[in-house]
UniProtKB/Swiss-Prot annotation:
InterPro entries: GPCR_Rhodpsn, GPCR_Rhodpsn_7TM, TRH_rcpt_1. Receptor for thyrotropin-releasing hormone (TRH). Upon ligand binding, this G-protein-coupled receptor triggers activation of the phosphatidylinositol (IP3)-calcium-protein kinase C (PKC) pathway. Changing residue 131 to T: In CHNG7; decreased affinity for TRH. This is Thyrotropin-releasing hormone receptor. Disulfide bonds join 98-179. The chain crosses the membrane at residues 29-51, 62-83, 100-121, 145-168, 194-215, 267-288, 297-319. Residues 1-28, 84-99, 169-193, 289-296 are extracellular. The keyword Disulfide bond applies. It comes from the Eukaryota. The gene is TRHR. GO terms for biological process: G protein-coupled receptor signaling pathway; phospholipase C-activating G protein-coupled receptor signaling pathway. Keywords: Cell membrane, Congenital hypothyroidism, Disease variant, Disulfide bond, G-protein coupled receptor, Glycoprotein, Membrane, Receptor, Transducer, Transmembrane, Transmembrane helix. Pfam families: 7tm_1. One of its GO terms (cellular component) is plasma membrane.
Length: 398
């Protein structure tokens, strides 16, 4: 059957080659260059800021790095060959390129879906089951899960090595080489449908259910008590601080923790929603074409589907920058755009030694550093009666 199919695909065609409109080529090249270029830079920055910034190395960010690598793979393996196809009108990467590039395309697509599923489950456990999260949602476990995700998708996508071949079509005015299938559509359509179910329908249903539970906990009910909330209380080892200040600070800290978790959940939910929406045109087209005798292949609609896929892979760094204060600060620092403080440094300093425990959550990505330093310093006034070095230092609270 395979030999018959190859001979049918490679048969000489004496009709003139269909010419793609110039405006279609220009629009394709410009859009793909802009979206893929920005997406590649943005996803590289995500990987760098998490790898180089210690406080950014959290389980959730570990999954976001996996997602960024998968998106990079999609942008490079799917976006850039689209440009050469538009310029030359033929496949220019040879047989090995056909196998490897297609493999990397599907590897990136499926790994991104699995990464989204992984951080959705991690968020659900961290927020809805905080006691279990103490040993389930750890950085080391996140790395193991990511290794499993990439190993599974790498093995699964090897299926495409056995389905692809170069197809040569001879026209009156040219010979066109394309990277396509060496089996008929009746055989590879079920594979598309399986991909649609495993890497789109199931993750989206799971995300809808889990984010429903998360929303109920965060926005409708009080957040479950974290066992660390009871063990990590503010230590009052100095008589310089009164009890009311400690209580108020602890309340502010708890409220900040809840607010941070809500913001992180919103950010990740936006990532999932955009994934569902931007992949919907292509996935729908694949399902519809599986039941049509002649597949629908209108050029402009196919371009729209591709652009949606590239946008999905390029937009996540923008979401992180808009919705995460930590990512925004890390991006600024990476670009050396951090503004210098406008205040002049003090001529001399006074050490204020307070024993403060920082409230943190090792299994979640917090957007704001939770600290009470500013609260304590605002309650402690430091005045300098003279500008000379022998000036007297007085505190309003003794």
């Amino acid at each position: 059957m395979e030999n018959e199919t190859v001979s049918e695909l490679n048969q000489t065609q004496l009709q003139p080659r269909a010419v793609v409109a110039l405006e279609y080529q220009v629009v394709t090249i410009l859009l793909v260059l802009i979206i893929c270029g920005l997406g590649i830079v943005g996803n590289i920055m995500v990987v760098l800021v998490v790898m180089r910034t210690k406080h950014m190395r959290t389980p959730t960010n570990c999954y976001l790095v996996s997602l960024a690598v998968a998106d990079l793979m999609v942008l490079v393996a799917a976006g850039l060959p689209n440009i050469t196809d538009s310029i030359y009108g033929s496949w220019v990467y040879g047989y090995v390129g056909c196998l490897c590039i297609t493999y990397l395309q599907y590897l990136g697509i499926n790994a991104s879906s699995c990464s989204i599923t992984a951080f959705t489950i991690e968020r659900y456990i961290a927020i809805c089951h905080p006691i279990k999260a103490q040993f389930l949602c750890t950085f080391s476990r996140a790395k193991k899960i990511i290794i499993f995700v990439w190993a599974f998708t790498s093995l699964y996508c090897m299926l495409w090595f056995f389905l692809l071949d170069l197809n040569i079509s001879t026209y009156k005015d040219a010979i066109v080489i394309s990277c396509g299938y060496k089996i008929s559509r009746n055989y590879y359509s079920p594979i598309y449908l399986m991909d649609f179910g495993v890497f789109y329908v199931v993750p989206m249903i799971l995300a809808t259910v889990l984010y429903g539970f998360i929303a109920r906990i965060l926005f409708l009910n009080p957040i479950p008590s974290d066992p660390k909330e009871n063990s990590k209380t503010w230590k009052n080892d100095s008589t310089h601080q009164n009890t009311n200040l400690n209580v108020n600070t602890s309340n502010r800290c708890f409220n900040s923790t809840v607010s941070s978790r809500k913001q992180v959940t919103k950010m990740l939910a936006v990532v999932v929603i955009l994934f569902a929406l931007l992949w919907m045109p292509y996935r729908t087209l694949v399902v519809v074409n599986s039941f049509l005798s002649s597949p629908f292949q209108e050029n402009w609609f196919l371009l729209f589907c591709r652009i949606c896929i590239y946008l999905n892979s390029a937009i996540n760094p923008v979401i992180y920058n808009l919705m995460s204060q930590k990512f925004r600060a890390a991006f600024r620092k990476l670009c050396n755009c951090k503004q210098k403080p406008t205040e002049k440094p003090a001529n001399y300093s006074v050490a204020l030694n307070y024993s403060v425990i920082k409230e943190s959550d090792h299994f979640s990505t917090e957007l704001d550093d939770i600290t009470v330093t500013d609260t304590y310093l605002s309650a402690t006034k430091v005045s300098f009666d003279d500008t000379c070095l022998a000036s007297e230092v007085s505190f309003s609270q003794s």
